[in-house]
């Protein structure tokens, strides 16, 4: 006889979290394993937590890809890696003028945070100086919050970025430590954690998340959320694998929209006070249920990603308005 699974009281669990009770790994796994028919109850419960901490505000972020491709790392998901055969644009560093122009485009798109991203293992000191020059001009001419994602950092580089006015540094954990060697062999999971810690020690707000759908188990998916809690990431981008043709993971089965919603809800339960951002793969994986994701998440990227297209900013603005939510400048 098939065992009947006991239905959880998701709303009670949400109020427990609001009252600052820490949920267990078993609770997180239960969210991920719940029957699909419970998804609206789960998202409603996640919204209780989201609304308590963030109301109806949605933070918009914009990415600029300042250096594309030409990366010596072999990350299996990435179209910019040395082993990728994906047909992407490849170029060296954009000029400081172009980076500053991008900041003004971010403002036109109603973004409060501008994310300066560059491919590669780690920046040289000269490259850090190049970014710092642009950051200083952006800080002098706009009210944007600035996030950088430049690869591995040493302590001196992190300190200089902080001094220049970089508010946030993104360095994703990407996947579970047990799954890491199957995704990348040119650096380790611990290398990534180290850079997050260096940024935090320099006084920069840490941004770190994962790419879901790269072969991790349900249990590992939950443990990623608790690892992000442990390293105290202030902003958590939840990416969903886009199986790009020409990369080693091109044949990987992508998550269903409901699986993505469960990830977002679980992440909100485990990290209730943190910025949860629906990131890469939003349009492709969530598809028509994108708006429901914002009942757990409180942040999205507006416009294109690094090498994949996003939807038009007007579509995102309309989605937010239709939900009765409102755009917030990303105060840290």
Curated annotation (Swiss-Prot):
The keyword Iron is assigned to this record: yes
S-adenosyl-L-methionine listed as a keyword: yes
Chain positions recorded as [2Fe-2S] cluster binding sites: 115, 147, 207, 277
Catalytic reaction equation(s): (4R,5S)-dethiobiotin + (sulfur carrier)-SH + 2 reduced [2Fe-2S]-[ferredoxin] + 2 S-adenosyl-L-methionine = (sulfur carrier)-H + biotin + 2 5'-deoxyadenosine + 2 L-methionine + 2 oxidized [2Fe-2S]-[ferredoxin]
Gene3D superfamilies attached to this UniProt entry: Aldolase class I
Gene Ontology biological-process annotations: biotin biosynthetic process
Reported cofactor(s): [4Fe-4S] cluster; [2Fe-2S] cluster
One MF annotation (Gene Ontology) recorded for this entry: biotin synthase activity
InterPro entries: Aldolase_TIM, BATS_dom, Biotin_synth/BioAB, Biotin_synthase, Elp3/MiaA/NifB-like_rSAM, rSAM
Binding, [4Fe-4S] cluster: 71, 75, 78
Functional summary from the UniProt entry: Catalyzes the conversion of dethiobiotin (DTB) to biotin by the insertion of a sulfur atom into dethiobiotin via a radical-based mechanism.
Subunit and interaction comment: Homodimer.
HAMAP family for this protein: BioB
Protein name, entry field: Biotin synthase
